[in-house]
Amino acid sequence: TKAFKAFGDSANYSLAPSGAFEAGSGGWSLSGASVVAGSESYKVHGAGDAKSLAVAATGTAVSPAVCVDVTRPTFRFFAKRTSGTWGNLAVKLRWKDSSGNTNETVVGTIETGTSWAASAPMSLSSVLPLWNVDQTASVQLVFDPENYGGSWAIDDVYVDPYGRG
């Protein structure tokens, strides 16, 4: 689906596992986070959507694993600050290297205000050690409020499975 077309992005996206939060947070690892009433205001997933994920200032939300290769370059989502006035939302990729070590790579920081806004496209495959077309990696998306500066809501997490255009 061209979920972000209204924002000038004509790429095709697929919903990340449980990324709309309408049926709960199945597969997500939540600490200080929960599914709540209220959905992003653009309704890109569906007009009837009514839920999102609230992440407390001291919380963290980690998505189910997503398989990434060079044909899955970006992901996007909606976010808004729900409390606090200065805190940012750090967005990271959690992945394992060839030695089995877990790594986290910051791919973006959200500084939006108290209204729902679409994130910019954030890198998936370009920040991972994927040098060959046939290489894949399993990654998790980590949403982590920085420095306890405020709580956040996220919704409609999408992965670009086809590349640009």
What does each of the following model-derived ranges do?
Residues N147-G165:
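Exposed low-complexity, polar/acidic, P/S/T/G-rich flexible segments that act as propeptides
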Residues G48-T74:
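Short beta-strands within extracellular/lumenal beta-sheet-rich domains
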Residues E22-G26, A65-V70, F78-W86, R94-K96, ...:
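Solvent-exposed strand-to-loop "edge" motifs in beta-rich extracellular domains
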Residues A3-G8, S14-S52:
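Extracellular glycan-recognition surfaces and repeat-rich motifs
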Residues S98-A137, D144-W152:
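Extracellular carbohydrate recognition and processing domains
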Residues V70-R72, W86, D134-S138:
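Extracellular Ig-like/FN3 beta-sandwich strand-entry sites
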Residues A90-R94, Y158:
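Beta-strand signatures of extracellular beta-sandwich domains
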Residues P73, G87-V91, G150:
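Short beta-strand/loop motifs in extracellular/secreted proteins, especially
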